[in-house]
Structures are given as C-alpha cells and as structure tokens.
C-alpha cells in the first residue's frame, strides 16, 4: 500500500525526460528507467516474530533494500524487486514489455532496462508497505521461487557475458 508521499518522492526523477519525450526531443536513454523504494512491512518477519524482537531487530529485508540496493545507485543498476516502484513506461516499451518466461519478471525487467541504457535507482526511504511471510514454509517457498527465477533470468539475459551489462 503506497504512502501518501509516494508520487511526490518518485515522480521528480522522471520530469526532465518525460518533457523531452513529449516535446519530440531526442531524450537521453541513459536516464531513469525506474525508481525502487525499499521493501517495508506492516508485520514482523519470521525472525523478528520468533525471537520476540520486533522493536530491536530490523526486518531481514532492510539490509538489502536500504543499504545494498542504494549502493547499486553508484552504477545505475538498482535491483527492481517488484513492488514499491515507479517505472518509466517508455523504458518498458523499449525493452519489449514485461518478460513472461520467468517467475521473477521484476528482476529481469530491471536488467533488460540496464542493458538498454536506462539507469535504475533505489531510495532509502520506504514509500509503501506490504506483508511479509509469517511461517517457515512460506518463507522457504518464496526464497526458492526467487532463486529459481533469478537463475532463469540470468540464463535468459546471458547476464555474466552480456557486454551491455558491463562498464
């Protein structure tokens, strides 16, 4: 569920390139493809809940969402994690739309955008919240899906040898 400030915080990243595109100017594709805000949750994750430490331990997704993904900004390749995101529609169109042959279409779409010359940014401030799995079976199912999906997307994109993904 997005916070009231979501669009106020994310839309400004796109203003210049949208104006250029609408005016028929040749907009620079090395502009923003998406803005990823951190994952944030209303409920305690499985570790916080079982350790009775909701107020003392951060959510286990916080380190990636608020630290690692923000560091990815230094090379314009923040990971698209599927929610809490604003995406430049033209970027989606330029890469052929959302991938349909993977279960982690979010991750692959972000990589495709980078390969097409777009930059993806992540912010430190959460702008939306959702629910995190609360039992071990659900966590294992989610993480197995993430792992399988990233492996499939890596194969689809030839991610380790794709010259468009290295600088």
Report residues per predicted region.
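Catalytic donor-sugar/metal-binding loop of nucleotide-sugar-dependent glycosyltransferases
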Residues: 101, 110-128
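Short Asp/Glu-rich motifs
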Residues: 46, 111, 132-133
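Active-site donor/metal-binding and catalytic loop motifs
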Residues: 124-138
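Long helical/loop segments within the catalytic core of UDP-sugar-dependent glycosyltransferases
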Residues: 4-103, 136-166
